[in-house]
């Protein structure tokens, strides 16, 4: 090759630390430039000698210049063919912008993605279904939820709504809050009025009754007729009533007290305006038939109670059976304010809370929680749970900073039937901190029993929330190996471990083990444990029950608080430790127990009860609330979380169910909940609403809050009104009912008539609707709920105006026959929902068949905005969501999401889930800072039937980030089952969106091995991995294997491989000579890029390099080497767009390979035949792209025979964007080198002469060139941003830390763009800032290159590789 060519190929690098050296030092820049210069050096030389070409002198001139002035001339000679280079970049930009429609996409329609496996999915949806996965900052005006279900039928025939929210932080609920831990027994069956238990609160203020009772191996509190309050270990407590503490061993104690008895032990500087006492009882029968009031306060410090507060530890006996009015238990709360009832209950090996007529509240370990409703969380395992709830049940788990205006809760249920036949609402929340509840708050852990069957009114459980405010109902329930919450008549709330919680309702936490607990409570029961600085205006208590029956048939109120410090009580305060005996049987009016609370303020009842191996609180008529560990949570609705395993879950909810898990900073105006269900049927026939919220922090609830952990028993069957349990709350304010109950190995809360809420571990969550999360395993759960159920889990800073929850369901039937709405929200952070939010994980069962109104599922969304419906569903090996009548939304893992509708996410596995839901179901999981104005949800379903016959709308949203949706958004991953057949209204699925704006309906659904979305009547939308996307209408894409998909979908298909590079169709090559005499390859295409017309600008203006354009015309089935093949001869023979190549190019290609050796291996994309073979192999769940026609698949889901080629295919697309970025950076380097020269040139000389050899030019021309260079730099920076966006679309599914370099690179780019764009001329450029900013771009690109190189050597199995073309007819 000639010396001039040599000089062109290898221009000398500038000496010294000049600006140009920043880009020059980058690896691969020179090769990116030289690749083009090289390929066309002979193309430049040959026309010079061509007889029909330019004169020989003209041809010789540039070569002479190169020889004479290599340093000067190299830049422009290199860039002489920039038009053709731009040609390639432009074509690639077009492609990249198509490829990355998951990000920066604008749609006027509805977008959705579906992965389906081994089943029929969504045949006959009448309106729209939206699913959104992994969204951040999503706004939904519809329904949002996420549900994990396993091995059972889930949510068939729910009549109204169920919401589940888990892990919310900073949640606001207007409902009830509570958390209950129940183990191996039946708990809270038939309590007639209210029972509140509060344990270990610190700095608690209670306006009701406070006390805490530890019971072991006996029967406790059966048939108390008036009121009993027990508070233990209080310090600096203020009581306006009775104060006392009793230590009893091996005998019968206080049987038949007619008026009032108060026992207080070891209190220091205590003031009680009510009744305060603490009782330690062992091996005997205790407090049977107290007619008026009994108060026990132990170890509380600076506690103020205006209601009833108490905490009870019960083991191996029957406890508190037949309480007619109310019982409140609050444990270990700190700085909690409750205006209602607060308590937390741990129950094991027994039946728990069966037939509670009114309300029961349990709050545990909440911190700075404010509840205006009811909050609780329930963990259920290996039994039937919550079958036949008549009104509402809400569950929330682990939410942080969540705001809910509806219901919020999260429930963990295992191996049992759960929440069958709840009539009104149940809320469960666990682990909230700083929770504010205006309703009822509690958390309950249930195991191996039947749980919450037939709740008529409300049940709320909230656990571990922090700074939670609830205006609705909030709770989280962990239930294992038992039936839970069957037939509660009114409300039950459980809240556990809240800190700084404020409750205006009932607050309490109950730990129950190996016995029957709280069966038939007539009015309200509240349990709160370990709250600190809690203020309760209602009832707060926490109960630990073990190996006995507890609190069966309380007629009026009972409150128990243990270990409160600085407690003030205006009502009854006390704490009782009971072992090996029967305790407090037949309390007619109110019993309050408060233990170890510090600086707690309660306006209702506060207490916590630990019950083991007995029957607990059977037949409560009024309310029970359980709240656990909430922190700074605010709810305006209902929040709860339920973990259910091995049972049937939430079948027959009539109104709404919301499930949300792990949301953070969530705002919801609808319903939010999350349900984890495993190996059982869950939530069948719930009549009204159930809310469960778990692990919320800084949650505000205006509804119901609670969390319930239930194991190996039946829990809370036929509670008539509400039960609230709050445990370990700190600085909690509850205006409703708050409590937390841990229940194991028993039946729990069967037959609640009104509401149950469970909230667990929420932080700073605000819910205006229903919020909760439910984990169900190996049992039947929540059958026949009539109104609403809400479950919220792990949300942080979530605001819900509707219902929010998340449900994990395994090995059972879940949520069959929901009539109204079910919402599931999981793991949301800073989420705002105006609708319904929830998340459910369901496995091995049929899921959500026959929902009549709406179900929303959202998973893993972050900072998502949705004005429509958003959700994501993962479904495997089962039929899912058949016959939903209205809408279903699933949202998972959203962050900073705002929902005005319903939000939830559902993971279903090996069971039937949510069959026959009449109204709406919403599931939201793992959302963070999500805003939804519509419906948002995500559903993971495995081995079961899912969502068949949805009548109205189903929305699924997963993992969306910064998405805004005005329509319906959701994402569903379905495997090996039938999914969403006959949805009447709408279902939307959206996955992995970030910063997405939707004005229509958006969703993403991953389905595998089944028929998907056949016969959608209106719209189905699936959107995956979109970031900063705006949709005004409907956008849909279906991805299906082994079945029919998207039948009758009236949307549009648009995908990049099929789009021709029409922009470049009319390119022509022309040669002109400008006044300087240099040759320039000009083409008409400059104008679209810069609008500059002077020939020297060609070096920085023009279409993409021809090798890329050629590749685009070939349909993107080429790699870099092929690009070069197509490009080099094109420049010789037929112009910019030629794609032919001949054997004479081999040496040049070999040389180019040498140039590219520094780039690593060059990979080839899969050709059409290979992609067809891949599609025929039915790879694991497909994730549809933002536009129809292609899909992505997790690398780990591909078979071994395809994995390597699919990896190479994905890397080829990454390299495609990488080379585009390198080429653009190389051009930027040249532009900055010119700017450098201009800034250094002496006056009177042409600055931007570009080596043209021209003499001085006048000022006007100089200014024009200045502007041309600046606009050229801006254009290149925009191109680079587009290239980065293309890289983003190829990096889906990677861990967050691996995606950070892309964000840093784009951020540095925007900074540099701002500096250049704000300068009017070259002189105005700030040299120092320019150097720093370019250095930042340089470093960010190096980090990006390292990431891409590491990805080639060590690709994670979670990487979504693609895009692959869908086979014809595979939509």
From Swiss-Prot:
Modified residues (Phosphoserine): 25, 31
Signal peptide: none
Stored Gene3D superfamilies: Flagellar protein FliS
Induction of its expression: Up-regulated during adipocyte differentiation.
27 X 33 AA approximate tandem repeat: annotated segments: 109-999
The organism's place on the tree of life at top rank: Eukaryota
Sequence ranges of the Sequence repeats: 109-141, 142-174, 175-207, 208-240, 241-273, 274-306, 307-339, 340-372, 373-405, 406-438, 439-471, 472-504, 505-537, 538-570, 571-603, 604-636, 637-669, 670-702, 703-735, 736-768, 769-801, 802-834, 835-867, 868-900, 901-933, 934-966, 967-999
Disease tied to this entry: Myopathy with rimmed ubiquitin-positive autophagic vacuolation, autosomal dominant: An autosomal dominant, slowly progressive myopathy characterized by skeletal muscle weakness variably affecting the distal or proximal lower limbs. Some patients may also have upper limb involvement or neck muscle weakness. Skeletal muscle biopsy shows distinctive myopathic features including rimmed ubiquitin-positive autophagic vacuolation and abnormal subsarcolemmal protein aggregation.
Function: May play a role in triacylglycerol packaging into adipocytes. May function as a coat protein involved in the biogenesis of lipid droplets.
Record protein name field: Perilipin-4
Organism of this sequence: Homo sapiens (Human)
């Amino acid at each position: 090759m000639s010396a001039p060519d040599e000089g062109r190929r290898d221009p000398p690098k500038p000496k010294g630390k000049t600006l140009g050296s920043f880009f020059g030092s980058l690896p691969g820049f020179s090769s990116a430039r030289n690749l083009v210069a090289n390929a066309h050096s002979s193309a430049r030389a040959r026309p010079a000698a061509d007889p029909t070409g330019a004169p020989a002198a003209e041809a010789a001139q540039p070569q002479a210049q190169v020889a004479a002035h290599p340093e000067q001339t190299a830049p422009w000679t290199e860039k002489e063919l920039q038009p053709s280079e731009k040609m390639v970049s432009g074509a690639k930009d077009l492609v990249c912008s198509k490829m990355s429609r998951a990000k920066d996409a604008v749609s006027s329609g509805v977008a959705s993605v579906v992965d389906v496996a081994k089943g029929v999915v969504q045949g006959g949806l009448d309106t729209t279904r939206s699913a959104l996965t992994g969204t951040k900052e999503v706004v939904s005006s519809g329904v949002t939820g996420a549900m994990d279900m396993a091995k059972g039928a889930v949510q068939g025939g729910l009549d109204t709504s169920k919401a589940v929210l888990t892990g919310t932080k900073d949640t606001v609920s207007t409902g009830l809050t509570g958390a209950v831990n129940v183990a191996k027994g039946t708990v809270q069956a038939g309590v007639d009025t209210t029972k509140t238990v509060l344990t270990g609160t610190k700095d608690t203020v209670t306006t009701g009754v406070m006390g805490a009772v530890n019971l072991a191996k006996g029967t406790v509190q059966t048939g108390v007729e008036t009121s009993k309050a027990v508070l233990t270990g209080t310090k600096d407590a203020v009581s306006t009533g009775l104060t006392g503490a009793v230590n009893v061993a091996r005998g019968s104690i206080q049987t038949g007290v007619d008026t009032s008895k108060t026992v207080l032990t070891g209190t220091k500087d205590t003031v009680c305006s009510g009744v305060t006492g603490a009782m330690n009882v062992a091996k005997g029968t205790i407090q049977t038939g107290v007619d008026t009031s009994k108060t026990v306060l132990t170890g509380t410090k600076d506690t103020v109670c205006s209601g009833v507060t108490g905490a009870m530890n019960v083991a191996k006996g029957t406890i508190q059976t037949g309480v007619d009015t109310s019982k409140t238990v609050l444990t270990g709360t700190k700085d909690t304010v409750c205006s209602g009832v607060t308590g937390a209950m741990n129950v094991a090996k027994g039946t728990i809370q069966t037939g509670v007529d009114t309300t029961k509240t349990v709050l545990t370990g909440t911190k700075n929680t404010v509840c205006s409703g009811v909050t609780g969380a329930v963990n259920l395992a290996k039994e039937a749970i919550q079958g036949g709830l008549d009104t509402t049940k809400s569950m929330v788990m682990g939410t942080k900073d969540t705001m809910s205006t509806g219901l919020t809760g999260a429930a963990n249920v295992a191996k049992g039937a759960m929440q069958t036949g709840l009539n009104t609402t149940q809320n469960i929340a666990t682990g909230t901190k700083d929770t504010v509840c205006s309703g009822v708050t509690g958390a309950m852990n249930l195991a191996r029993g039947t749980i919450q069957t037939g709740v008529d009114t409300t049940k709320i459980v909230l656990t571990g929330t922090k700074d939670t405010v609830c205006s609705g109902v909030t709770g989280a329930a962990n239930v294992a190996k038992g039936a839970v919450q069957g037939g509660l008549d009114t409300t039950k709330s459980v809240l556990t471990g809240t800190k700084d919680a404020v409750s205006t309702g009932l607050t309490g936490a109950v730990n129950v083990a190996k016995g029957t607990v709280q069966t038939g409570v007539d009015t309200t029961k509240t349990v709160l444990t370990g709250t600190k600085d809690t203020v309760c205006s209602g009832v707060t208590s926490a109960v630990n029950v073990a190996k006995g029956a507890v609190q069966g048939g309380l007629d009026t109120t009972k409150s128990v608080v243990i270990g409160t410090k600085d407690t003030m009580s205006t009502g009854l305060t006390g704490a009782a430790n009971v072992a090996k005996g029967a305790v407090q049987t037949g309390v007619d009016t109110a019993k309050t127990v408060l233990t170890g609370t510090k600086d707690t303020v309660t306006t209702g009842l506060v207490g916590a009860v630990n019950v083991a191996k007995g029957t607990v609180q059977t037949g409560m008529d009024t309310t029970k609330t359980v709240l656990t560990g909430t922190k700074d949570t605010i709810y305006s609705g209902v929040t709860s979380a339920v973990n259910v395993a091995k049972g049937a879950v939430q079948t027959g909810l009539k109104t709404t169910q919301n499930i949300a898990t792990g949301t953070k900073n969530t705002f919801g105006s609808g319903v939010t909940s999350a349900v984890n269900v495993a190996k059982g049927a869950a939530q069948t026939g719930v009549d009204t609403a159930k809310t469960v919220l778990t692990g919320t922090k800084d949650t505000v609830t205006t509804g119901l809050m609670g969390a319930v952990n239930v194991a190996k028993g039946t829990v809370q069957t036929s509670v008539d009104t509400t039960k609230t349990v709050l445990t370990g709350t700190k600085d909690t304010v509850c205006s409703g009912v708050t409590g937390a109950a841990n229940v194991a190995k028993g039946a729990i809360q069967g037959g609640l008539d009104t509401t149950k809420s469970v909230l667990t571990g929420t932080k700073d969550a605000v819910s205006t609707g229903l919020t909760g999360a439910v984990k169900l395993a190996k049992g039947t759960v929540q059958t026949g709920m009539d109104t609403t159920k809400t479950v919220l889990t792990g949300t942080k800073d979530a605001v819900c105006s509707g219902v929010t929850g998340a449900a994990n369901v395994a090995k059972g039937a879940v949520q069959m026959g929901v009539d109204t709405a079910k919402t599931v929200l999981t793991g949301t952070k800073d989420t705002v929902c105006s609708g319904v939010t929830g998340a459910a994980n369901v496995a091995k069962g049929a899921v959500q068949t026959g929902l009549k109104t709406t179900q929303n599922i959202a998973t893993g969304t972050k900072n998502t905005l949705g004005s429509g419906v958003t959700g994501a569903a993962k479904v495997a090996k089962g039929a899912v969501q058949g016959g939903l009548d209205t809408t279903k939304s699933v949202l998972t893992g959203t962050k900073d999401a705002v929902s005005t509708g319903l939000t939830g996410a559902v993971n279903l596995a090996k069971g039937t889930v949510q069959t026959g839901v009449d109204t709406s179901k919403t599931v939201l999981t793992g959302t963070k800072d999500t805003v939804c104005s519509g419906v948002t949800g995500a559903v993971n379903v495995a081995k079961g039937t899912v969502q068949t016959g949805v009548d109205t709308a189903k929305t699924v949203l997963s993992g969306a980030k910064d998405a805004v949706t005005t329509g319906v958004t959701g994402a569903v991953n379905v495997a090996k089952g039938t999914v969403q057949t006959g949805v009447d209204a709408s279902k939307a699925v959206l996955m992995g969106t970030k910063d997405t704006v939707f004005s229509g309906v958006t969703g993403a659904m991953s389905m595998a091995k089944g028929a998907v979305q056949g016969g959608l009547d209106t719209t189905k939308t699936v959107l995956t991995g979109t970031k900063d996307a705006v949709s005004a209408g409907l956008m849909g894409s279906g991805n299906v294997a082994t079945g029919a998909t998207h039948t009758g979908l009236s949307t549009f298909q648009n995908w990049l491989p099929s789009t021709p590079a029409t922009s470049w169709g009319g390119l022509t090559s022309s040669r002109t000579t400008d006044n300087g005499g240099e040759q320039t390859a000009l083409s008409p295409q400059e104008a679209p890029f810069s609008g500059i017309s002077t020939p020297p600008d060609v070096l920085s203006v023009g279409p993409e390099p021809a090798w890329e354009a050629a590749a685009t015309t070939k349909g993107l089935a080429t790699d870099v080497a092929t690009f070069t093949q197509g490009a080099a001869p094109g420049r010789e023979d037929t112009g910019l767009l030629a794609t032919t190549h001949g054997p004479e190019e081999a040496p040049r290609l070999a040389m180019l390979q040498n140039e590219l050796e520094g780039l690593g291996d060059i990979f080839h994309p899969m050709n059409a035949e290979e992609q067809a073979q891949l599609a025929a192999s039915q790879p694991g769940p497909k994730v549809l792209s933002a536009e129809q026609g292609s899909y992505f698949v997790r690398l780990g889901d591909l078979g071994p025979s395809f994995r390597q080629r699919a990896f190479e295919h994905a890397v080829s697309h990454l390299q495609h964007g990488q080379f585009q970025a390198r080429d653009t950076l190389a051009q930027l380097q040249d532009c900055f080198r010119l700017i450098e020269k201009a800034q250094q040139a002496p006056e009177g000389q042409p600055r931007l002469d570009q080596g043209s050899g021209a003499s001085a030019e006048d000022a006007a021309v100089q200014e024009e060139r200045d502007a041309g260079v600046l606009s050229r730099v801006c254009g290149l920076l925009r191109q680079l941003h587009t290239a980065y966006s293309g890289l983003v679309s190829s990096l889906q599914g990677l861990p967050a830390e691996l995606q950070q370099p892309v964000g840093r690179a784009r951020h540095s780019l925007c900074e540099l763009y701002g500096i250049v764009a704000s300068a009017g001329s070259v002189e105005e450029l700030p040299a120092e800032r320019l150097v720093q900013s370019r250095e930042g771009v340089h470093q960010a690109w190096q980090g990006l290159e390292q990431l891409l190189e590491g990805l080639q050597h060590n690709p994670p199995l979670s990487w979504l590789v693609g895009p692959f073309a869908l086979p014809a007819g595979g939509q």
